[in-house]
């Protein structure tokens, strides 16, 4: 409820007197002089005028008392000396209290008062009573203003328990009443008496006390006004208590902790260290609201999920019900079958028994017995036959099903058998064709010594169309190489000592049945060509990689072969004296199909050819040129599928005469693809050997064609061992032709492929440069589809080479560059690296070409290569071309390629650098399909003319990067870490990828949203310390009737508006018990109402009501009894309900027996409150609604609808009305009676209600404020009083002067009185106190902070003199009977405003 505001009114004496108002209406407060002067003309001095003494506004109880004082004899009743003594005593108490309060605590500043000291000093004259009262009024006004300001600064509840505050309130109204009394008396008309010494001394004491009060006020003024601006900006209705302030601070701290705990990226704008300003608090609350919104969204999603789950659960329930019904049906059928069998068996037994009895009794003949037995046997046989037939039918069905299944399995087995037979036929055909091709190759590749120049390098024999179980088709090109007999047994012996060990050799037995394994082991040279092909759509691309491996003397590293996935094979075919061609299973070789498919693949996609002019060597023989051109033509026929680009590179061999190439720098390219769970490892190890062979033998024994078909999840490890030998080669072209290695490796999507080429130091002396170039050359063309990553590491150690003919070398190596696939959106990261060396250069052009090649190397993110700095280059052209060869590797889209080029220490003597440079150029054109990007790290040395000496220092530093630092690989989540010798340091970034979409539970835990639930209305209530608006309460109980009522009562400790309970209790009758707890009233539920209406069991209904409601409320049954037994039922009613409440029937008796019945009536009800407004209002509600309203709102206030019923059912409805509202409300008939008998009725009514009130005036008053009465709420508890005091009664209709007396605690003086009509208090909360007819007014004086509601004292005053003490009186009655609130509710109970 809203707090009360203070208003000040001025009296005729220029003394401002405060009057309290509220938005709901006026309370029962003392009347100002102006209001009372309006009614002076209406007052009848002959009648007794009550002086109302109002209790102090304590936090414990507010009780109204009445003290009738005759206005004509006031001067005799109030002796001046005694009154002044009491006032001085109280002023001393107030001063001591204020000194204790304000002497130590200077918190309350206030606005200065304009007051002259001469006004205070003038009061010491004491000429008349009016001047003294005026002074007191001014002083009380000042104190009231100070206290009102204190109330605005958060210490109101301290003063509710402070005696000084109570005294000021009491003193204010006391002075007001004394003024009015003195104004209406004739005492002021007479001459004032001569001043007495005691009076003078008392007045002097009062002046001193006033001066001390002024000092205290000045202390309060000294406080700075800066803090007041913030504090006074608060609303007037805010409860400002120290506990509330502490709770606010605690809540602010909790808010900061909450924000810190739940601070995320979007909430970090709100800092917990901001100053406590309105803006910062707004931001904090906004942040909290955002968190709550997130929680609300999460809750909404959870609710939606719950709805879906509920729907699924209902569906499951329905399905379960259907199944249960079906089960019941089946059980019923089964039971029927069992019953029929039982019936048949029982019938048979009964028949047998009956037949036996008949045989014994009647003595039937044997023929009849035989007939009966035969009939029984027939019946039994029939039953058995029926059962057998049923069983046979069931077995027949089962057998038919089994037969169907067996037929299906047989068909499947047949299909599988046919499939296997067809596969075997295909395999036999492929093997036969392999043998024929081998024979053709043997017949065509016989070469002698130096005549090998005229032998063609390659012959394309056929194309195999391979279809495997997975439905994939691969096309293989079969190349035949000439067979050259070995002329040196030393080479064979050395090479046979180091054999190649691989688990893939076990697979050779399935394909190469005609091969002898010992021949494979004794071969001196190995050339592995791995071909990994998969059937792809025309939009997909295919790469082929060529790898040339020479035989080795010593194998430095063990050969590691990756595990093969299911349906994948790894085939390693050696090329020994007769050339061996390995093919996959189920291959159908057709030369025509090979040609057709070659043409289709050649012209599928737009091709891009890039030609370099070929300059013939001056000293080159024509035969050499022819052989080179043939090899180039063969290599140019390698095509790609759609979306691929073809790039043919023709280098220009420059042939200076004999140049010895001491060391050749080859870069090891490392292409690591980490997309799938596959890895391809290629290790090319070149050990050191010193071998001397003729060219024909060397060339033919080192060619090995590997066709490896692998599908997804295939790991292929190819180790190419290239021995570093010291060779003296006689024939050049034979060596050049046989050194060519074609490695076609095509992996399907998500197949990582890793190639490591390792060439250790070698000391080679080659007679012919072509043979050496081919043995050294390793071309890796690794094609991966989109979504792959290739990392190639190429390492080139120092070598000592002797090359005679460079042209053949350059031309042959140029052939291997034609697996080029340049799809759209290539990404090519090129970081040129230059080695800072101190070489001895003969030809500057060759050096520049080598450097150009080095700068085209691709390294991902910081790849470095640190070469050695002791190398000698004879011709820079050859070196530059060498480097150019290695730079043309393109990685697929969305991937990065790491290329590390290491140029170690070399001593190079180049005979023909042009051929060497072209050799290197051939190796670098490895192009991978997919969406790729080109990143070029430009350098100034991109031309042939620039040498190492012209490089800048920073460009040389780039060449000194180590390959170990380029380990940043970009991988997908599905890739696995690839470990090998050269790439073991590379981290697998796929394992470190964070979760992109965290789950909701993770967000809740990270944001600590699970702790937000604890912040509920109670904590907010403690934080705000405020009562919500009534409109909010109106909506809340209606929407949440079950849970909000108790919460509202406990949280705010206030009486919730009555209208809400009315509406709610009508619509939700089952929640009335909860309403009873909220309003602390006995609520009668519907069950009780129905029980009350039972006429057959009146006694049980009464006891049940007494036990449940804790009130002696007798409802409809008593009404019925009082109709039949008017006299006897009155006593029964009084005993039953514990009160002298005589309803309806007495009203009829009062009309016939006015005098006697009035007294009895007055004794019965103890109150005489008549409300005329109720007559007009109680017209539209039924009987049940009357009880409901009374119990729901906890007041005896029936608003309007009852009177219409009372007119039609006067006897019963009046009793019902009285029971419903719990008050003695006298309706219609007494009002008419009082009007007709005014004189006689006044005294009995005065005795009845405890004060003499004119009926007509009270009616007018109650019309506007029907729910408040001066006397009916006397015994109410604090919580109920708060609800009442938020409304005020218009005092204009009172005919008397009212004086409020608020005594303080004084244990020395006690007043006890026992009324002759006093009876023992009943169990009801409301207690009745009556005085005899000789008393004109009752005064109830409770102790401050000690007296509870429902206890009072009666003081009898003579009509002439009043002798009483203003301080408090001691309570001699027992403990109060009202209910004690819960501790939580008591803390939150606010105190009324004044």
Swiss-Prot record:
Residues 437-446, 464-473, 503-513, 521-538, 546-571, 663-679, 711-721, 780-790 have a biased composition (Polar residues). May play a role in tumorigenesis. Keywords: Coiled coil. Residues 349-362 have a biased composition (Basic residues). This is Coiled-coil domain-containing protein 7. Residues 345-375, 431-617, 634-806, 819-842 are annotated as: Disordered. InterPro entries: CCDC7. Pfam families: BioT2. Residues 363-375, 447-462, 491-500, 583-600, 695-707, 722-736, 791-806, 830-842 have a biased composition (Basic and acidic residues).
């Amino acid at each position: 409820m809203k707090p009360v505001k203070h208003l000040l009114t001025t009296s005729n004496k220029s003394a401002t007197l405060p009057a309290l108002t509220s938005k709901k209406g006026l309370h029962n407060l003392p009347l100002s002089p102006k209001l009372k002067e309006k009614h002076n003309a209406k007052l009848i001095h002959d009648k007794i005028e009550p002086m109302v003494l109002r209790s102090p506004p304590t936090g414990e109880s507010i009780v109204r008392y009445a003290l009738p004082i005759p206005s004509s004899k006031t001067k005799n009743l109030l002796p001046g000396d005694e009154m002044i003594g009491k006032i001085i005593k109280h002023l001393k108490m107030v001063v001591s209290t204020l000194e204790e309060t304000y002497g130590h605590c200077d918190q309350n500043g206030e606005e200065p008062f304009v007051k002259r000291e001469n006004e205070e000093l003038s009061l010491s004259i004491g000429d008349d009573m009016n001047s003294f009262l005026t002074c007191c009024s001014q002083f009380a006004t000042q104190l009231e203003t100070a206290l009102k300001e204190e109330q605005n600064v958060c210490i109101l509840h301290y003063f509710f328990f402070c005696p000084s505050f109570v005294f000021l309130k009491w003193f204010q109204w006391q002075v007001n009443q004394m003024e009015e009394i003195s104004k209406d008396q004739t005492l002021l008309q007479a001459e004032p008496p001569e001043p007495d010494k005691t009076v003078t001394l008392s007045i002097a004491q009062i002046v001193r006390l006033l001066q001390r009060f002024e000092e205290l006020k000045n202390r309060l003024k000294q406080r700075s006004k800066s803090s007041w601006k913030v504090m006074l900006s608060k609303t007037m209705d805010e409860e400002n208590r120290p506990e509330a302030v502490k709770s606010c601070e605690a809540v602010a701290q909790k808010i900061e902790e909450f924000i810190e705990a739940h601070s995320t990226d979007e909430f970090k704008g709100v800092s917990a260290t901001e100053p406590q300003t309105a803006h910062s608090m707004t931001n904090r609350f906004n942040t909290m609201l955002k968190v709550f919104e997130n929680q609300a969204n999460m809750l909404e999603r959870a609710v939606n999920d719950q709805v879906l789950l509920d729907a699924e659960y209902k569906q499951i329930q329905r399905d379960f019900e259907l199944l249960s019904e079906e089960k019941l049906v089946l059980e019923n059928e089964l039971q029927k079958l069992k019953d029929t069998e039982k019936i048949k068996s029982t019938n048979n037994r009964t028949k047998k028994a009956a037949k036996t009895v008949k045989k014994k009794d009647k003595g039937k003949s044997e023929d009849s017995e035989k007939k009966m037995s035969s009939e029984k046997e027939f019946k039994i046989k029939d039953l058995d036959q029926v059962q057998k037939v049923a069983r046979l039918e069931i077995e027949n069905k089962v057998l038919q099903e089994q037969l169907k299944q067996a037929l299906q399995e047989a068909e499947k087995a047949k299909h599988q058998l046919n499939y296997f037979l067809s596969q075997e036929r295909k395999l036999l055909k492929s093997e036969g064709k392999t043998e024929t091709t081998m024979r053709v190759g043997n017949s065509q590749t016989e070469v002698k010594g130096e005549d090998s120049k005229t032998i063609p390098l390659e012959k394309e024999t056929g194309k195999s169309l391979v279809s495997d179980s997975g439905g994939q088709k691969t096309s293989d090109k079969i190349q035949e190489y000439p067979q050259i007999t070995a002329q040196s047994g030393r080479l064979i012996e050395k090479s046979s000592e180091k054999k190649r060990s691989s688990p893939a050799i076990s697979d050779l037995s399935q394909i190469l049945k005609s091969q002898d394994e010992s021949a494979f082991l004794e071969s001196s040279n190995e050339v592995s060509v791995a071909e990994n092909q998969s059937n792809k759509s025309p939009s997909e691309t295919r790469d082929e990689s060529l790898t040339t491996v020479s035989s080795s003397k010593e194998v430095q590293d063990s050969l590691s072969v990756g595990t093969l996935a299911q349906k994948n094979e790894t085939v390693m075919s050696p090329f020994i004296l007769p050339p061996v061609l390995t093919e996959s299973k189920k291959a159908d070789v057709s030369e025509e199909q090979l040609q057709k498919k070659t043409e289709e693949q050649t012209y599928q996609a737009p091709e891009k050819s890039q030609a370099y002019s070929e300059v013939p060597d001056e000293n080159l023989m024509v035969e050499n040129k022819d052989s080179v051109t043939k090899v180039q033509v063969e290599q140019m026929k390698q095509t790609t599928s759609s979306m691929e680009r073809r790039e043919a590179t023709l280098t220009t061999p420059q042939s200076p005469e004999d140049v010895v190439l001491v060391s050749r720098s080859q870069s090891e390219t490392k292409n690591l693809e980490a997309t799938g769970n596959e890895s391809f490892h290629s290790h090319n190890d070149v050990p050191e050997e010193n071998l001397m062979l003729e060219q024909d033998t060397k060339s033919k024994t080192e060619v090995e064609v590997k066709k490896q078909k692998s599908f997804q999840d295939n790991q292929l490890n190819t180790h190419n061992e290239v021995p570093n030998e010291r060779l003296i080669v006689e024939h050049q072209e034979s060596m050049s032709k046989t050194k060519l290695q074609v490695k076609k490796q095509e992996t399907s999507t998500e197949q990582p492929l890793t190639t490591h080429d390792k060439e250790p130091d070698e000391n080679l002396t080659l007679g012919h440069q072509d043979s050496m170039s081919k043995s050294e050359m390793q071309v890796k063309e690794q094609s991966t589809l989109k979504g792959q990553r290739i990392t190639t590491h190429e390492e080139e150690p120092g070598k000592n080479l002797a090359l005679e003919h460079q042209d053949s070398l350059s031309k042959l190596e140029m052939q291997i560059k034609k697996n080029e696939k340049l799809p759209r959106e290539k990404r090519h990261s090129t970081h040129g690296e230059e080695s800072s060396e101190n070489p001895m250069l003969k030809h500057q052009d060759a050096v520049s070409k080598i450097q150009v090649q080095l700068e085209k190397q691709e390294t991902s993110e910081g790849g470095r290569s640190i070469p050695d700095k002791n190398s000698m280059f004879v011709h820079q052209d050859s070196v530059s071309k060498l480097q150019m060869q290695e730079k043309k590797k393109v990685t697929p889209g969305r991937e990065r390629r790491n290329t590390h080029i290491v140029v170690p220490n070399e001593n190079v003597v180049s005979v023909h650098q042009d051929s060497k440079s072209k050799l290197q150029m051939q190796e670098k054109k490895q192009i991978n399909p997919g969406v790729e990007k080109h990143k070029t790290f430009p350098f100034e040395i991109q031309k042939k003319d620039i040498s190492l000496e012209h490089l800048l220092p920073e460009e040389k530093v780039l060449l000194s990067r180590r390959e170990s630092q380029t380990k940043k690989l970009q991988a997908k989540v599905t890739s696995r870490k690839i470990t090998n010798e050269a790439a073991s340091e590379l981290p697998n970034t796929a394992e470190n990828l964070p979760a992109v979409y965290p789950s909701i539970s993770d967000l809740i835990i990270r944001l600590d949203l699970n702790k937000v639930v604890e912040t509920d209305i109670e904590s907010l209530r403690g934080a705000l310390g405020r009562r919500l608006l009534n409109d909010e309460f109106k909506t809340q109980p209606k929407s949440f009737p079950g849970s909000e009522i108790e919460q509202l009562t406990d949280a705010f400790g206030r009486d919730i508006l009555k209208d809400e309970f009315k509406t709610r209790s009508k619509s939700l009758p089952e929640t009335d018990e909860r309403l009873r707890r909220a309003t602390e009233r006995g609520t009668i539920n519907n069950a009780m109402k129905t029980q009350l209406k039972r006429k057959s069991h009146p006694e049980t209904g009464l006891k049940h009501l007494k036990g449940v409601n804790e009130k002696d409320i007798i409802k409809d049954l008593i009404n019925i009894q009082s109709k039949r037994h008017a006299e006897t039922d009155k006593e029964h009613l009084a005993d039953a309900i514990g009160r002298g409440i005589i309803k309806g029937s007495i009203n009829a008796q009062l009309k016939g027996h006015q005098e006697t019945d009035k007294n009895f009536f007055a004794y019965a009800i103890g109150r005489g409150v008549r409300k005329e407004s109720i007559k007009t209002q109680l017209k539209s509600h039924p009987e049940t609604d009357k009880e409901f309203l009374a119990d729901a709102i906890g007041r005896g206030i029936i608003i309007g609808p009852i009177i219409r019923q009372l007119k039609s059912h006067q006897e019963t409805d009046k009793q019902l009305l009285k029971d419903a509202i719990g008050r003695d409300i006298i309706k219609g008939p007494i009002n008419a009676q009082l009007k007709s008998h005014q004189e006689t009725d006044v005294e009995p009514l005065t005795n009845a209600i405890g004060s003499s009130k004119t009926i007509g005036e009270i009616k007018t008053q109650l019309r506007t404020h029907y729910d408040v009465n001066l006397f009916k709420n006397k015994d109410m508890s604090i919580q109920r009083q708060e609800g009442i005091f938020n409304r005020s009664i218009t005092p204009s209709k009172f005919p008397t002067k009212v004086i409020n007396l608020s005594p303080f605690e004084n244990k020395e003086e006690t007043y006890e009185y026992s009324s002759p009509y006093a009876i023992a208090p009943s169990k009801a909360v409301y207690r009745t106190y009556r005085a005899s007819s000789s008393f004109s007014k009752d005064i109830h004086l409770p102790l401050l902070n000690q007296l509870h509601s429902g206890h009072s004292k009666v003081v009898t005053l003579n009509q002439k003199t009043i002798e009483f003490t203003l301080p408090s009186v001691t309570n001699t009655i027992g403990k109060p009977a009202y209910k004690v609130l819960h501790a939580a509710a008591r803390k939150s109970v606010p105190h009324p405003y004044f």
